[in-house]
């Protein structure tokens, strides 16, 4: 086995290893109550990360093999060496024009569809009639994707496989005949009633319409409604172009995205359809930042600033910030966001989240609870100073509650006795002379600024209510 084949075999095992990791993750989720509140990693994020790595490794392997072949073109071995094929069965089905077998095989391996998708376009090119092959695959497996099928998860997997097949057909730009369009029209009419508000159904339907050029059979309003439904998918803009929506219709769609708060989706449509002149993407991005900041504050307020709610709000705000940063870097408009200091905002939010995590560990039940008398002497943990940036979650600082005075007012404490001396109504409290005239004069001593020792601690001692129990009182 050559090095390239060994690497290809290892890449092919990634999906199997991901399934084992998924099982371990599910076991961990069963004990979620024992985890830190800040642990909010989802399996979709993990799966997306490893799928991205798998795709990147596969592309780099293909590039390395291709460059090796071009560099050694004179050697016989280099001429015969081909890019390693991870799914040779795909080509076998395509060479035999076995569409039904191809569809069933892809559905059985639907969990590995990302790896399959890398080879599918080249495999379909091996077929003499790619368009009938794809239609046969869809017709042969369409019953598995109906809403009445036994497993809804399987139905979703089948629709995803249909999307992969139709995307590959769009990529190779296969020849279409009227008979093929008629077959595709029949499938489309059967598919349409099942769409409802399900984006996965709308995505497959629109790919069928785009691949077999059926846009004229449906109203533009219907097509726009379905595109609005699938706007979260990256293929939405490609489908718009393939179906042939005019610029005015796309502009109406963008305005609808803006009116419904899907600002980042609107940004994607604006740039990919070159509509920067009609809209102001920089202003839209800044509005998105403002909305995410206000939403985070609102979530915190509604959740009474609990630790869990604060972490959730921070995660959502971080996600929005990173999405904006990605667009800003891709479109080279960093100069428009110098004042916002987006990277610093991300770091500050991450620091706030880490600080809350440390505070949670410090106050966790694992720490022995301190006596109540000693708690009052502890200082509150220092809170990071808020900066001038507006992206921090505005959590009001803890204000000490106003305690009632521990002693009565001076006028209630002090009384003037018949001899003109100040006396205290508190038992055991001796009061010194309030005024030199009190001893010899006939005028009662003024009590405007009395001196009473109960309010003095002397020699830097803390007030009585703050003294730990080992100080004599």
From Swiss-Prot:
* Pfam families (alphabetical): Frigida (PF07899)
UniProtKB keywords: Coiled coil, Developmental protein, Differentiation, Flowering
Question: Coiled-coil intervals in this record?
Answer: 3-35, 306-361
User: What tissue expression does the UniProt record report for this protein?
Assistant: Expressed at low levels throughout the plant, with slightly higher expression in developing seeds and the highest expression in pollen.
- Locate the compositionally biased regions of type Polar residues: 361-373
Entry keyword Nucleotidyltransferase: no
Q: What happens when the gene is disrupted?
A: No effect on flowering time, due to a partial redundancy with FRL1. Frl1 and frl2 double mutants flower earlier than frl1 single mutant.
Q: Where is this region: Disordered?
A: 356-384
GO biological process per UniProt: cell differentiation; flower development; vegetative to reproductive phase transition of meristem
Question: Which superkingdom, per the lineage?
Answer: Eukaryota
What's in the misc comment field?
Answer: In cv. Columbia and cv. Landsberg erecta, either FRL1 or FRL2, but not both, is functional and required for FRI-mediated up-regulation of FLC.
Role noted for this protein: Inactive FRIGIDA-like 2 protein.
Family, as annotated? Belongs to the Frigida family.
Q: What is this protein called?
A: Inactive FRIGIDA-like protein 2
> What species was this sequence derived from?
Arabidopsis thaliana (Mouse-ear cress)
The major lineage groups are: Eukaryota, Viridiplantae, Streptophyta, Embryophyta, Tracheophyta
Instruction: Quote the gene name from the UniProt entry.
Output: FRL2
